[in-house]
């Protein structure tokens, strides 16, 4: 009788080029790479003498990383697939997706199966497994709103652990996995709780304007209408990484307290802002960058996109150092003009 396949077996790819595995399209090489299609492969890493001693980097869609050098370790390409409803009750569906699933495809799948809620997060690049790390968000919705739990493998021990929202400690574009847990875990599956009573989130003017352009009143909008509107907005504003390398929004929108905001508004009355809980105020980083005159400008092969100042792009041949030099120049100008610190979203490796 033939032996069943070993789901934990690891096939190593030596001197693996990474340009196709990061949306900036930055050239870098990993000492090794491995395609991970089963959680058991993550769990077996610490027992594999070929790689157990090496630095490890889990990579999903590569939409939140800037390679500044070659990676002298093993890059683990998370390709764990699968989408399913694990259970439902009178109030909600509980939907699980593999960490390697493409985020946008997963959002589209939930809508196609009559389970709305995630439509404001349509077309965000990356994978399901990367979404909790960053607590992705757009157009008035953060991933944590519908998050239920996730399963992650601790790379040093191979032990699987389940994390609820409290343990993930989500913040604005932040989580445990971006702080204390950074580099320690691989997220293999995420479960979302999607309420059966749909709550449309139409607080952003861009969304209501797009609906209006389509002849749809906000109160009449369906989940599919919102999904289509968000997709159209993102495609109009953001470059396709396959055509122009980028990592989406490069900087977080800074959040400041009311006193600092009042002082800023006294100097800059038209500053774009959004009230936040606890009296804080979120500023539009793209507006700050644009006001500093950076939209469309370049430093070498790295540039600020000409339609969205929050997006840095690779015009061809840019290195990670080029991107970081541009980012620092922008940060310096925003700090000098507005007294505000911009924090990058991508992880630099």
UniProtKB/Swiss-Prot annotation:
GO molecular function terms attached to this record: FAD binding; UDP-N-acetylmuramate dehydrogenase activity
Annotated EC: 1.3.1.98
Reaction equation(s) it catalyzes: UDP-N-acetyl-alpha-D-muramate + NADP(+) = UDP-N-acetyl-3-O-(1-carboxyvinyl)-alpha-D-glucosamine + NADPH + H(+)
Pathway recorded for this protein: Cell wall biogenesis; peptidoglycan biosynthesis
GO biological process: cell division; cell wall organization; peptidoglycan biosynthetic process; regulation of cell shape
A cellular component term, taken from the record's GO annotations: cytosol
Coiled coil: none
SUPFAM superfamilies in the record: FAD-binding/transporter-associated domain-like, Uridine diphospho-N-Acetylenolpyruvylglucosamine reductase, MurB, C-terminal domain
Cited Pfam families: FAD_binding_4 (PF01565), MurB_C (PF02873)
Location in or out of the cell: Cytoplasm
Domain of life: Bacteria
Domain FAD-binding PCMH-type: start-end pairs: 24-197
InterPro entries to which the protein is assigned, alphabetical: FAD-bd_PCMH, FAD-bd_PCMH-like_sf, FAD-bd_PCMH_sub1, FAD-bd_PCMH_sub2, MurB, MurB_C, MurB_C_sf, Oxid_FAD_bind_N
Keywords linked to the UniProt accession: Cell cycle, Cell division, Cell shape, Cell wall biogenesis/degradation, Cytoplasm, FAD, Flavoprotein, NADP, Oxidoreductase, Peptidoglycan synthesis
PROSITE patterns, sorted: FAD_PCMH (PS51387)
Enzyme class at the top of the EC tree: oxidoreductase
Cofactors that this protein relies on: FAD
Active-site residues (renumbered): 173, 249, 345
Task of the protein: Cell wall formation.
PANTHER family: UDP-N-ACETYLENOLPYRUVOYLGLUCOSAMINE REDUCTASE
Family listed: Belongs to the MurB family.
Full protein name: UDP-N-acetylenolpyruvoylglucosamine reductase
Taxonomic source organism: Burkholderia ambifaria (strain ATCC BAA-244 / DSM 16087 / CCUG 44356 / LMG 19182 / AMMD)
Gene: murB
